[in-house]
Amino acid sequence: MSARISKQLRLSVPPCLANRTTASNSSSCVTEVEPLLQSFSSTLVLIVLATVIFCLVVLSLSTFHMHKSKMKKRKIEKAQEEYERDHCSPKAERGHLHGMGRGGTHGSPTSPTIQRKEHIRLDLGASVNEEPQLEASGLDRATEHLQQSVVLS
């Protein structure tokens, strides 16, 4: 009996609803595009998701590369400052000690003093020897050599 009822219901239902289509005003059945949109939207979602993941990977790699180059520059600057501090300041102090050994006063050294960032301060009242200038030019060459070796490595 249930088979008869289901057959009667099927016959009473218009063919548009049985085929999952809708009837328009002209009573013709129009196919629905919903299954196509569902498959297209899921494909679109997968493409968007893959694009987002790819963009995140590219962004993280570029950020890492920029940070790495920034840290490398900082490391080079720090090494240069450390080199200047370690190699220029002791020479300046040695210049003071040499000046005192030659009979100079504690307040005014007799040789040029090399300060940080390679500025040379001369005492106008004292005589200037050639040796301190040679030491300063040697420091300039040593600093250039260090900068070249740091840049190359």
Swiss-Prot record:
Region described as Disordered: 75-115
Start-end of Basic and acidic residues biased regions: 77-96
Glycosylated position list: 19, 25
Record's GO cellular component terms: membrane
Transmembrane regions: 44-64
Presence of the UniProt keyword Transmembrane in the record: yes
Disulfide links within the chain: none
Domain of life, per lineage: Eukaryota
Signal sequence extent: 1-18
Sequence ranges on the Extracellular membrane side: 19-43
Membrane topology: Single-pass type I membrane protein
UniProtKB keywords: Glycoprotein, Membrane, Signal, Transmembrane, Transmembrane helix
Protein name, per record: Uncharacterized protein C11orf87 homolog
Upper lineage: Eukaryota, Metazoa, Chordata, Craniata, Vertebrata
